[in-house]
């Protein structure tokens, strides 16, 4: 591209040819992190060459515009401003993220906000036909802008995985993408008035269902394209990935988003081999296609510690900023800097997991991001619906952990021991036996390395929540 400035839309400058941003996502969903842990993430990002933070704060900062929503241990605004000041001193641009369609559990589960739901019995999606939804969200966005300060240039409005979007009678009477775009435009007006560019995730607007109407989305919106599988072997390709050229042809700036932690991981480790390949693919794509940036997401609902994602955080930065001769060589150089004391091949076996056994711990037991432990009989319901875990898959994973665990040290060994215990429980269930009692205090202490006390206890309750009920068929 020869031109740096490709246009003005609604008064917001659109830049395409600048050096790509390298963005680290800090996600407060599910977990309330200690201040020093967030500070450590910021310093890690700055050392690695990241120049922006995507802040997904949800209910972990005490906002005036969302009374009754923040958790008890949430940061005060002054405490959080201290972290923002630290990030600024490290050269990290703030990019706030506020969900405007789905993933609204932390708001809509509260009694004062039930009138904003798309469906009365679901609390994950806003009904954007209701004027009071846009009114509330504009107030929240305005408070975010005040909190994050004048350094904000981009603002992420979420927009992903709104699974029941446009299903109420009023919304259903509208063309979905017209409704979607109108709501985005209304909320984004607060941003445009300050010269801030809005952005959204890709999966709604670039899905097979809606991609024909992608042109209805205003061009000043940055498309945050996410695919946490592409580039890895033996995985699926998400439908919106094949639509990426269309978004570029329509003139959208695009950020590619890979991940260090996503669906399919265990609660103790990210699956290193998958995420490594995905991030290498993403970094190469951003450089080759001159995209607007690479975002390294980290979804806290998956629970594994941020410090155990550090090899992937460093690897992604290296592959974008100063790639070596090969991704494998870069990975081999990164691992020892993160306290890994085994070969890359052994490390892959040590951290391996399988999507098919994710349902046998308590995370995401009803597919809501609401940080609620499962009920007492949930394991029995899962067994009735899905059957027992695949014994061969569990056995293969167990063999890898047992073989490599003696090489691990420090927090890596601690997480490996917990991974081993969880796999042994899965193996017992596969045999039709009751799993061993979980090491509750060890798990609380493990998550307590990074989370506040109440948050660590809740995380342990979620992960360990699938205990057999009174009427279980397990022996």
Per-segment meaning from a language model:
Residues 3-14:
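Sec-dependent N-terminal signal peptides
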């Amino acid at each position: 591209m020869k031109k740096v400035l490709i246009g003005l839309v609604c008064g917001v400058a659109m830049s395409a040819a600048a050096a790509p941003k390298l963005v680290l996502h800090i996600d407060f969903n599910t977990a309330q992190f200690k201040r020093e842990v967030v500070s450590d993430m910021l310093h890690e990002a700055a050392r690695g060459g990241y120049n922006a933070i995507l802040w997904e704060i949800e209910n972990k900062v005490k906002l005036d515009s969302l009374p009754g929503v923040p958790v008890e241990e949430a940061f005060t605004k002054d405490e959080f401003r201290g972290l923002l000041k630290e990030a600024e001193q490290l050269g990290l641009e703030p990019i706030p993220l506020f969900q405007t369609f789905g993933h609204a559990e932390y708001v809509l589960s509260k009694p004062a906000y039930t009138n904003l739901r798309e469906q009365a019995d679901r609390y994950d999606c806003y009904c954007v036909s209701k004027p009071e939804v846009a009114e509330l969200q504009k107030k929240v966005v305005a408070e975010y802008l005040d909190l994050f300060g004048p350094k904000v240039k981009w603002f992420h409005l979420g927009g992903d995985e709104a699974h029941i979007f446009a299903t109420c009678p009023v919304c259903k009477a509208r063309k979905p993408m017209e409704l979607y775009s109108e709501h985005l435009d209304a909320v984004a007006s607060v941003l445009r008035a300050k010269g801030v560019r809005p952005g959204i995730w890709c999966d709604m607007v670039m899905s097979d269902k809606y991609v024909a109407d992608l042109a209805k989305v205003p061009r000043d919106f940055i498309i945050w394209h996410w695919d946490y599988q592409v580039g890895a072997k033996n995985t699926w390709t998400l439908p919106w990935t094949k639509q990426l050229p269309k978004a570029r042809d329509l003139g959208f700036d695009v950020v590619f988003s890979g991940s260090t932690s996503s669906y399919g991981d265990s609660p103790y480790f990210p699956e290193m081999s998958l995420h490594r390949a995905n991030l290498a693919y993403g970094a190469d794509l951003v450089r080759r296609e001159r995209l607007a940036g690479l975002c390294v997401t980290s979804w806290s609902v998956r629970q594994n510690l941020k410090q155990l994602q550090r090899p992937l955080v460093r690897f992604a930065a290296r592959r974008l900023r100063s790639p070596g001769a090969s991704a494998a060589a870069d990975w081999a150089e990164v691992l020892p800097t993160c306290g890994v004391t085994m070969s890359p091949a052994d490390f892959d076996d040590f951290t391996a997991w399988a999507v098919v056994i994710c349902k046998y711990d308590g995370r995401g037991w009803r597919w809501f991001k609401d940080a609620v432990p499962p009920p007492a009989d949930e394991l029995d319901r899962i067994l009735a619906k899905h059957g027992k875990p695949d014994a061969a898959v569990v056995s293969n994973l167990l063999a890898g952990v047992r073989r490599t665990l003696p090489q691990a040290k420090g927090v890596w060994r601690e997480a490996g021991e917990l991974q081993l215990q969880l796999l042994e429980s899965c193996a017992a269930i596969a045999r039709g036996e009751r799993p061993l009692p979980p090491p509750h205090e060890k798990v609380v202490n493990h998550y307590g390395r990074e989370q506040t006390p109440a948050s660590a206890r809740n995380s342990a309750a979620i992960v360990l929540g699938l205990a057999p009920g009174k009427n279980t068929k397990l022996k």
